[in-house]
């Protein structure tokens, strides 16, 4: 079984190793990062679970289901706050020599005139020429998860900062704002 440059087991798009009919998943595999195309290891449970399902399908039905890769979406609670990230942060983009622009916005978790609206910060990294999203980080007390999940989906689908402003959100003052924090982040990044 071939080992890749990162020390992980090299797999193809069906998660098959260099040995026919032998598959690998989870922390052990090396797979190209969807944004950079460079091999990387991803130590997160969500991609590993998806990989398990893909391998089960491929073992039963033949190599019919492809793995798209993972961009590293993660979240943690730090006391009362939530911090989350997806894709490539500025530090990693610098290390890789990838030109990027960044924007940081400060919004509220829901409509500011409704009680208990709490601060929510979003930082975006993106291609300064095309606006394609590279990554996002967010910190706040409420609603961080749904914002990062939406941005992660856009990144995986090749979305741009303009697409952030076009995402249709459900709106009611207790749970969101008429201009959602990711729309504000998109408008701001689009102005750079």
Predicted regions: what they are:
Residues 1-57, 150, 154:
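FAD-site-proximal beta/loop scaffold in flavoenzymes
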Residues 80-86, 95-192:
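Flexible, glycine-rich terminal cap/loop adjacent to redox cofactors
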Residues 38-42, 58-87, 167-171:
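Active-site-proximal substrate-binding core of FAD-dependent oxidoreductases
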Residues 56-63, 155, 189:
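Short, hydrophobic alpha-helical segments
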Residues 8-13, 61, 107-111:
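Glycine-rich, charged/polar anion/phosphate-binding loops
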């Amino acid at each position: 079984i071939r080992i890749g440059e990162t020390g992980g087991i090299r797999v193809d798009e069906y998660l098959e190793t260099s040995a026919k009919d032998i598959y690998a998943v989870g922390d052990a595999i090396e797979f190209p990062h969807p944004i950079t195309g460079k091999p990387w290891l991803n130590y997160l449970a969500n991609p590993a679970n998806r990989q398990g399902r893909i391998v089960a399908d491929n073992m039963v039905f033949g190599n019919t289901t492809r793995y798209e890769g993972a961009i590293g979406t993660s979240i943690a609670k730090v006391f009362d706050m939530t911090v989350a990230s997806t894709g490539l942060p500025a530090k990693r983009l610098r290390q890789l020599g990838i030109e990027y622009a960044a924007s940081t916005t400060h919004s509220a978790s829901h409509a500011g005139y409704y009680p208990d609206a709490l601060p929510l910060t979003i930082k975006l990294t993106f291609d300064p020429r095309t606006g394609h999203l590279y990554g996002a980080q967010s910190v706040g007390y409420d609603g961080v998860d749904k914002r990062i999940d939406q941005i992660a989906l856009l990144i995986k689908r090749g979305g741009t900062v303009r697409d952030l402003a076009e995402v249709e959100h459900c709106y009611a003052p207790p749970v969101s704002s008429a201009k959602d924090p990711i729309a504000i982040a998109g408008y701001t990044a689009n102005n750079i």
